[in-house]
């Protein structure tokens, strides 16, 4: 037989397959014919025997028939017993033949049945053989697939081993990096602490030098005053008689912009103590009072922590009486999304709006229209608060990117970023100087900033979120989420007073005389607090008034005669501060909750902004 590698191998395989199939068929079908074949052979033997016996008996009738024609004398010669025996034998053989025929018929019927059964079994065998072949092919496929799967599993195991090794290496590397990061953070904290301590020492030294210089100046002036008290001084009305201090005061007043007709009268009243007609006959005591006033003015100017001189801007009262708005004059879709903050500049003709689109738009109020002036860009998050410095040349904004940012009017990009908070900054306000600011945040801190160096000079830790802040001469007032208003002395480290209110505080507004504070809270009320006695003087409510958010702003009118706030239904509510009654309800073009309102310093118009991108000018 040819080997498996030669060309005759396929022919040998199918021959062996046929032999195996025949042997299998012989084993399975042999048992069915073990009884049938011997019986059939026995039947054939009997049939052959009967055939032979029949052939022997065939001539006997011929031999018997002639005897019937013999005469009577011949019948006597036959044996009387021979004829019955032959007849009986024939009958017997006929009976046996019939029985054998029946047996042959039965056997033939059984052969037919067995043949039919054999055909059925052969068809079943073929079906089973075909099914077995299909199953064998399927088994071969499954074995091949199993081999492939096993190979793939081995490959995956190898890849997993490689990945595990790489992961362990990366884990070790990350551990080293984290350890290095912790060391660097500790070093950074140490450096920051040393830097803060060094800056604090430097600030203390500067303050000490300034204090010594001030004490020396006061001592020198005191000596000069003592010398001047011993002689009589005659002062004329000329411009040089009041000394350098008076000239400086006049120069400061000369820098202010020329007032409007209504402002001139107030300015003249404000300047009148320095231009009195009795100046030609001043006595020595009057001269001393004037010099002391000038010295007190210089002392109030002071210096910042960093040593840079602070300018205080006198707010000239230009609002004789605020006028209630009656109608909307201009409506603009100013921002791409909701508008959160609005503020008028000191000259009442410049307006700033800030929104969730990270932009601050400056507008000129021209008659009864708002005209676009400039767009301030570069904010790192949604604008939550805007404020002008006393000169009107800088804009400070609080943003959601954990910082406050400073712009100069006329420059589109941010000038300075005040970073240090750990959560959203909700309020940012200038103090009464352009060099200092205060911010409040949701990280439960209030921070004071020296803007000359962009340095946090003080951090106040509070127990609740800060939603708004306002600043006085020497006081910082903050409104919080725990339904409390806190007062902080800028010259001391601790809280000086806490006033509880019902509802989370959303905004604060300080009157121009710094004697009254207006708060808005989520209990849908406005409260007027008298700062002289530190108690709540008035509570304003109205049917339909409801705060729309945690940053809804309410403001005083410039003359403190009215309180203004916007509601979630888009209406504006105005209360009379003296009587506590609702003076007016303005239902205008707002279709969404009003977030903030602003009343210009002249009292002639106001602006409201809402969550639907609208800015509305009222007059």
Swiss-Prot record:
The UniProt entry, under InterPro entries, shows: ATG16, Autophagy-rel_prot_16_dom, G-protein_beta_WD-40_rep, WD40/YVTN_repeat-like_dom_sf, WD40_repeat_CS, WD40_repeat_dom_sf, WD40_rpt
- Kindly list the places in or outside the cell where this protein is found, as annotated in its UniProt entry: Cytoplasm, Cytosol
Q: Which residues form a coiled coil?
A: 116-227
Which residue windows does the record flag with biased composition (Polar residues)?
A: 60-70
* UniProt function note: May play a role in regulating epithelial homeostasis in an ATG16L1-dependent manner.
Q: How does it assemble?
A: Homooligomer. Heterooligomer with ATG16L1. Interacts with ATG5. Self-oligomerizes to form a 800-kDa complex composed of ATG12-ATG5 and ATG16L2. Interacts with RAB33B.
Record protein name field:
Protein Atg16l2
């Amino acid at each position: 037989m040819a080997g498996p590698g030669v060309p005759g191998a396929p022919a040998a395989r199918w021959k062996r397959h046929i032999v195996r199939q025949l042997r299998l068929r012989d084993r399975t079908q042999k048992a069915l014919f073990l009884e049938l074949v011997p019986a059939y052979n026995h039947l054939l033997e009997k049939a052959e025997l009967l055939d032979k016996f029949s052939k022997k008996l065939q001539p006997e009738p011929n031999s018997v028939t002639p005897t019937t024609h013999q005469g009577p004398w011949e019948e006597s010669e036959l044996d009387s017993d021979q004829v019955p025996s032959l007849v009986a034998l024939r009958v017997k053989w006929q009976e046996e033949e019939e029985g054998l025929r029946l047996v042959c018929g039965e056997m033939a019927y059984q052969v037919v049945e067995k043949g039919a059964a054999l055909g059925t079994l052969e068809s079943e065998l073929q079906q089973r053989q075909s099914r077995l072949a299909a199953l064998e092919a399927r088994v071969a496929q499954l074995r091949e697939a199993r081999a492939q799967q096993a190979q793939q599993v081995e490959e995956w195991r190898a890849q997993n081993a490689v990945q595990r090794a790489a992961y362990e290496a990366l884990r070790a590397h990350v551990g080293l990096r984290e350890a290095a990061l912790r060391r660097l953070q500790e070093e950074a904290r140490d450096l920051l602490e040393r830097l803060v301590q060094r800056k604090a020492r430097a600030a203390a030294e500067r303050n000490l030098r300034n204090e010594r210089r001030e004490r020396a100046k006061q001592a020198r002036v005191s000596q000069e005053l003592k010398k001047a008290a011993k002689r009589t001084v005659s002062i004329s009305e000329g411009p040089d008689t009041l000394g350098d201090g008076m000239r400086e005061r006049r120069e400061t007043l000369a820098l202010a912009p020329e007032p409007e007709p209504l402002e001139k009268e107030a300015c003249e009243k404000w300047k009148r103590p320095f231009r009195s007609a009795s100046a030609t006959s001043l006595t020595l005591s009057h001269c001393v009072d004037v010099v002391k006033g000038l010295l007190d003015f210089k002392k109030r100017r002071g210096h910042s922590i960093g040593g840079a001189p602070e300018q205080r801007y006198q707010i000239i009262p230009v609002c004789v009486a605020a006028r209630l708005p009656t109608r909307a004059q201009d409506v603009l879709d100013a921002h791409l999304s909701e508008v959160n903050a609005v503020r008028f500049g000191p000259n009442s003709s410049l307006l700033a709006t800030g929104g969730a689109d990270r932009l601050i738009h400056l507008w000129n109020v021209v008659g009864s229209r708002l005209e676009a002036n400039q767009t301030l860009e570069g904010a790192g998050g949604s604008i939550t608060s805007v404020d002008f410095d006393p000169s009107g040349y800088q804009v400070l904004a609080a943003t959601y990117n954990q910082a406050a940012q400073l712009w100069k009017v006329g420059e589109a990009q941010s000038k300075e970023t005040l970073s240090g908070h750990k959560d959203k900054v909700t309020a940012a306000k200038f103090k009464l100087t352009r060099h200092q600011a205060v911010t409040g945040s949701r990280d439960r801190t209030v921070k004071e900033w020296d803007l000359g160096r962009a340095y946090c000079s003080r951090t106040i830790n509070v127990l609740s979120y800060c939603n708004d802040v306002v600043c006085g001469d020497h006081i910082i007032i903050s409104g919080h989420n725990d339904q409390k208003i806190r007062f902080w002395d800028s010259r001391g480290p601790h809280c000086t007073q806490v006033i509880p209110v019902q509802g989370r505080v959303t905004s604060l507004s300080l009157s121009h005389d710094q004697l009254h504070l207006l708060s808005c809270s989520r209990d849908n009320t406005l409260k007027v607090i008298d700062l002289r006695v530190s108690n709540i003087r008035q509570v304003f409510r109205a049917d339909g008034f409801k705060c729309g958010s945690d940053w809804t702003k309410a403001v005083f009118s410039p003359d403190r005669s009215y309180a203004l706030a916007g509601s979630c239904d888009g209406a504006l509510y105005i209360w009379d501060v003296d009587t506590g009654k609702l003076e007016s309800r303005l239902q205008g073009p707002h279709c969404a909750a009003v977030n903030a309102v602003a009343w210009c310093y002249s009292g002639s118009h106001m602006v409201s902004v809402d969550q639907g991108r609208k800015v509305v000018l009222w007059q």
